[in-house]
From Swiss-Prot:
Cellular component aspect of the GO annotation: cytosol
InterPro entries according to UniProt: FAD/NAD-bd_sf, GIDA_C_N, MnmG, MnmG-rel, MnmG-rel_CS, MnmG_C, MnmG_C_subdom, MnmG_C_subdom_sf
Main location: cytoplasm
Binding site for NAD(+): 273-287
Official protein name in the record: tRNA uridine 5-carboxymethylaminomethyl modification enzyme MnmG
Annotated residues for binding of FAD: G13, G14, G15, H16, A17, G18, V125, S180, Q370
Organism from which the protein derives: Pasteurella multocida (strain Pm70)
A molecular function (GO) term: flavin adenine dinucleotide binding
Family membership noted in the UniProt record: Belongs to the MnmG family.
Purpose: NAD-binding protein involved in the addition of a carboxymethylaminomethyl (cmnm) group at the wobble position (U34) of certain tRNAs, forming tRNA-cmnm(5)s(2)U34.
Length: 629
């Protein structure tokens, strides 16, 4: 039976990738259908109750700059906001919000249900309808068929998902939800490379059974950040603290004594887990010299007693999980509400995708999210947005669009996946981007909002606000260029009081702002440079653009030079252990692959352009920088 209406775009799955994938073509004016197995879990935070972080916060801002939902939902659900790396340079500063799961899911559903051109239907999809090498619809479990010109698959961990708790396992997409087995079997018949990955989650703890009085509190920032460029602190709900406890030798002894009951160490789980979010079993074994690991006790919401113990993801049996939890300070009488578990699932080799996230073998079929080998809500949402945009452009027979590496972290993510592939769950870090001084959280709108406007993704209110901000930035930069202070000025004494060294020659406002001891607030407190601008976002842009101008230009030159070193030889017995600045992951991969040239090294999965720069410097220092034949 065919559904009475035809659609331009169908999205399968209502998680973080699926919601962004559905909203984008709908905003572009295309008739879109979102199919989900359960409308009550749209926007569900299946693992940790948080949005943002290093690299991830950058993705959230980019999604927002293009009219996406994640930042707005986080602003409305965030119960603790922090700016990470606030004392470091602007390239690595990142926003993170602890989120109320219920409020987040509520914000997502409201946005979806109020979006024009978007329908939602609850049914599991079991098959994809193909006409030779082109997708033309889907089939649901009840036999209902839907026609569409493009289909986006965002199935998360549901494809042949298998949940492990100790040596017991059963099929499931996540705790409480069924796996998508029929669709997984159908996809395995297609010309796509499939493999298995795994991820895990910690047990959830009853807050009423924790002794918080003996634990350290962690509050959010006093000056609360916001994620969305259209957001406001007024949108934030009540802010609450997290708490910190630690594992100890007793905890580690419990884990070591029960490794034979771990599905990972017993060889039952075949999928590779996320390197940067390891299970507590992995942490204890990999870092055996450490006798303690910090654990963050994160509230799951304002109206929930559930606590998420960030740092003890595990698939050990329930009785062992209880011993682990009860071994920690403040947790001696803690009770588990939900057991931790590991989940294995199908993912597709992202090298079989175009940079638009359309499959190379089937026209009009797009993949986004964890099924492409990534981990994290933000990575999924970024892919969903990109797939949604390109599905919309495909339907309209318009030229595809995807961001370059120098345009967005979404561009870095997709380029890494489609060019290099991945054998382990991929997450974004600022260190993966060679252009990170250009790809800051604060300038995501200037990088991407004009493109979003061209694509029809943002409304006129956002466009007008963006243009006003850009105008404010340009006018203020012009003003600071035109105001000069000279050694004979009547304001010299006032200026010298705040300058690290006395002014000996004429300087503009921009020249003074470049000084390390100077910032915009101090500069505009000086009589010649008053008044200060009210637009704080524009102020931040002005200050960063002036202070980091030289660094940005230097980085662009570095990239051009790096391209010239494609054939630079690496000695066969080069010692990577002496190269300072390489991450353990990169060093291990270089040792394993032993590339013969810089070009070859740059194409190893996980070896970042930033790592290549470090390697080039080391080769030069050791007198080994020679071009290949």
């Amino acid at each position: 039976m065919f559904y009475t209406e035809n659609y331009d775009v169908i999205v399968i799955g209502g998680g973080h990738a699926g919601t962004e994938a559905a909203l984008a073509p709908a905003r572009m004016g295309l008739k879109t259908l979102l199919l989900t197995h359960n409308v009550d879990t749209l926007g569900q935070m299946s693992c940790n109750p948080a949005i943002g972080g290093i690299g991830k916060g950058h993705l959230v801002r980019e999604i927002d700059a293009m009219g996406g939902l994640m930042a707005t939902a986080a602003d409305q659900a965030g119960i603790q906001f922090r700016t990470l790396n606030s004392s470091k340079g602007p390239a690595v500063r990142a926003t993170r919000a602890q989120a109320d799961r219920v409020l987040y899911r509520q914000a997502v559903r409201i946005a979806l249900e109020n979006q024009e051109n978007l329908d939602i239907f609850q049914q599991e999809v079991t098959d994809i309808i193909l006409d030779q090498d082109r997708v033309c619809g889907v089939v649901t479990k009840m036999g209902l068929k839907f026609h569409a010109k493009a289909v986006i698959l965002t199935a998360g961990t549901f494809l042949s998902g298998k949940i492990h708790i100790g040596l017991e396992n059963y099929t499931g997409g996540r705790a409480g939800d069924p796996a998508s087995v029929m669709l997984a079997d159908r996809l395995r018949e297609l010309n796509l490379r499939v493999d298995r990955l795994k991820t895990g989650t910690p047990p959830r703890i009853d807050a009423r059974t924790i002794d918080f009085s003996v634990l350290a509190k962690q509050h959010g920032d006093e000056k609360l950040p916001v994620f969305s460029f259209m957001g406001s602190v007024d949108q934030h709900p009540r802010q609450i603290p997290c708490f910190i406890t630690h594992t100890n030798e007793q905890t580690h002894e419990v884990i070591r004594n029960n490794l034979d009951r771990s599905p990972m160490y017993a060889g039952i789980i075949e999928g590779i887990g996320p390197r940067y979010c390891p299970s507590i079993e992995d942490k204890v074994m990999r870092f055996s010299e450490r006798n303690s690991h910090q654990i963050y006790l994160e509230p799951e919401g304002l109206t929930s007693n559930e606590i998420y113990p960030n740092g003890i993801s595990t698939s050990l049996p329930f009785d062992v999980q209880m011993k682990i939890v009860n071994s920690m300070k403040g947790m001696e009488k803690a009770r588990i509400i939900k057991p931790g578990y590991a989940i294995e699932y199908d993912y597709f080799d992202p090298r079989d995708l175009k940079p638009t996230l359309e499959t190379k073998s089937i026209r009009g079929l797009f993949f986004a999210g964890q099924i492409n080998g990534t981990t994290g809500y933000e990575e999924a949402a970024g892919q969903g947005l990109l797939a949604g945009i390109n599905a919309g452009l495909f339907v309209q027979e318009k030229e595809a669009w995807f961001p370059r590496r120098d345009q967005a972290y979404i561009g870095v993510l997709v380029d890494d996946l489609c060019t290099l592939g991945t054998k382990e769950p991929y997450r974004v870090f600022t260190s993966r981007a060679e252009y990170r001084l250009l790809l800051r959280e604060d300038n995501a709108d200037s990088r991407l909002t004009p493109i979003a406007h061209q694509l029809g993704l943002i409304d006129e209110k956002r466009w007008a606000r963006f243009n006003q901000k850009m105008e404010n930035i340009e006018l203020e930069r012009q003003r600071l260029r035109q105001i000069w202070l000279h050694p004979r000025s009547e304001y010299l004494d006032e200026a010298n009081k705040v300058l690290g060294s006395p002014l000996v020659r004429e300087a503009s406002g921009e020249d003074l702002l470049r000084r390390p001891e100077m910032n915009y607030q101090i500069l505009t407190s000086l009589t010649p440079f008053q008044p200060a601008m009210d637009d704080q976002e524009a102020v931040e842009q002005v200050e960063i653009a002036i202070k980091y101008q030289g660094y940005i230009e230097h980085q662009q030159e570095e990239i051009a030079r790096q391209k010239r070193h494609e054939s630079t030889a690496i000695p066969a017995h080069f010692d990577y252990t002496v190269v300072s600045g390489l991450s353990n992951e990169v060093r291990a991969k270089l040792e394993q692959h032993r590339p013969v040239s810089i070009g070859q090294a740059s194409r190893i999965s996980g070896v970042t352009p930033a790592a290549i720069s470090i390697l080039l410097v080391s080769l030069k220092k050791q007198g080994m920088l020679k071009r290949g034949e």
